[in-house]
UniProtKB/Swiss-Prot annotation:
Its main location: cytoplasm. The active site is at C116 (proton donor). The modification 2-(S-cysteinyl)pyruvic acid O-phosphothioketal is found at C116. Transmembrane segments: none annotated. The keyword Secreted does not apply. This is UDP-N-acetylglucosamine 1-carboxyvinyltransferase. Cell wall formation. Adds enolpyruvyl to UDP-N-acetylglucosamine. Phosphoenolpyruvate binds at K22, N23. It is found in: Cytoplasm.
């Protein structure tokens, strides 16, 4: 397995161009199964999870071509309706194939999924949502099997809890249902809005995305179209933190500041000077150490759980003590023991971590456990004394496009060491 070797004590400064959002590109690629005509998706990042999705869609009979940042999807001749275990096991997002398959073809089956090792992320909300739209669901031999006679039927669905994944599944399936569907307590993330905008480009009638009440008027078919995936707010936040923890200055280009309000507020609280334009953000630490901050993760527009690991690192090298409470996923502090091996001082109590800032971390051999945790370990290596080796970086390749190239452009001394 590949590793990163990072030489530390670097002030990270410069410009970085932000890639398309993984968390929008994935649901949009799966939603393209609903289209009877070809679709062109622009600004699609080159990531492991995207490659897996393309393989899966191809296996279902979709014609797919990649050309730089664009992906051309033609699902007009889909003739397979099963997403098999060997592709699904590495990626939880595969469950998003189920809604479009049953909505358009009346049948679909997906192996129960894999992905990051972050606590329990059950698929039950996806299943109950599809059942409320009239699908019959069976769990057999490790597969979720969905079927319906005729079309799905619109329904009034109140979600038990806010779930990005289940909101995408229900919204996608409801686009081709008969009648109107209302989703109450829907997730409000920018990636949900992007998926809805994509579907509307193809002829869907979705309103209210970005609020907790989404209305979908069913249509009989979706056509083709061209759509540009929104920029990755989590990648943007990660590079802003890189400058914040190293006393540096960074400008993130081709991003969307309006998707990062909670993150920018906390960076300002930590002492960063921040300016924003329509599609750029600049952060200047002016050589200062950040101040520790206290926050809790929450569904959008609250503080994103996908930025929690990076801000844990910020707190661990900040002045003072900060408390972080994780309310979205259990078991999402697996990076903290690794950072403690680098000299950080922290206590974990249930879903809370208390971070006591230290002036300097020391390089060590550490292991990535999930996507965002691995990013925090790489950033820690950039500022630690000495050399840090980050193992199991396949996690990072699932969600960051060419992270080592982008960090090098900011002055990081990082190299990929090929594994056996």
């Amino acid at each position: 397995m590949d590793k990163f070797r990072v030489q530390g004590r670097t002030r990270l400064s410069g410009e970085v161009t932000i890639s398309g959002a993984k968390n929008a590109a994935l649901p949009i690629l799966f939603a393209a199964l609903l289209a009877e005509e070809p679709v062109e998706l622009q600004n699609v990042p080159k990531l492991k999870d995207i490659d897996t999705t393309i393989k899966l869609l191809s296996q279902l009979g979709t014609k797919i071509e990649r050309n730089n940042g664009s992906v051309f999807v033609d699902a007009s001749a889909v003739n397979e309706f099963c997403a098999p275990y060997d592709l699904v096991k590495t990626m939880r997002a595969s469950i998003w194939a189920l809604g479009p398959l049953v909505a358009r073809f009346g049948q679909g089956q997906v192996s129960l999924p894999g992905g990051c090792a972050i606590g329990a992320r059950p698929v039950d909300l996806h299943i109950t949502g599809l059942e409320q739209l009239g699908a019959e669901i069976k769990l057999e031999e490790g597969y979720v099997k969905a079927s319906v006679n005729g079309r799905l039927k619109g329904a009034h669905i109140v979600m038990d809890k806010v779930s990005v994944g289940a909101t995408v599944t229900i919204m996608s399936a409801a686009t081709l249902a008969e009648g109107t569907t209302v989703i109450e307590n829907a997730a409000r993330e920018p990636e949900i809005v992007d998926t809805a905008n994509f579907l509307n480009t193809l002829g869907a009638k979705i309103s209210g995305a970005g609020t907790d009440r989404i209305t979908i008027e069913g249509v009989t078919r979706l056509g083709g179209g061209v759509y540009r995936v929104l920029p990755d707010r989590i990648e943007t936040g990660t590079f802003l933190v890189a400058a914040a923890i190293s006393g540096g200055k960074v400008v993130c280009r081709q991003t969307r500041p309006d998707t990062l309000d909670a993150v920018l507020a906390k960076l300002r609280e930590a002492g960063a000077d921040i300016e924003v334009g329509d599609d750029w953000i600049s952060l200047d630490m002016q050589g200062k150490r950040p101040k520790a901050i206290t926050f809790r993760t929450a569904p959008h527009p609250g503080f994103p759980t996908d930025m929690q690991a990076q801000f844990s690192l910020l707190n661990l090298v900040a002045e003072g003590t900060g408390v972080i409470t994780e309310t979205i996923f259990e078991n999402r502090f697996m990076h903290v023991p690794e950072l403690i091996r680098m000299g950080a001082h922290a206590e974990i109590e249930s879903n809370t971590v208390i971070c006591y800032g230290v002036e300097q971390l020391s390089g060590a051999q550490v292991m990535a456990t999930d996507l965002r945790a691995s990013a925090s370990l790489v950033l820690a290596g950039c500022i630690a004394e000495g050399v840090t080796i980050v193992d199991r970086i396949y996690h990072i390749d699932r969600g960051y496009e060419r992270i080592e190239d982008k960090l090098r452009a900011l002055g990081a001394k990082i190299e990929r060491v090929k594994g056996e």
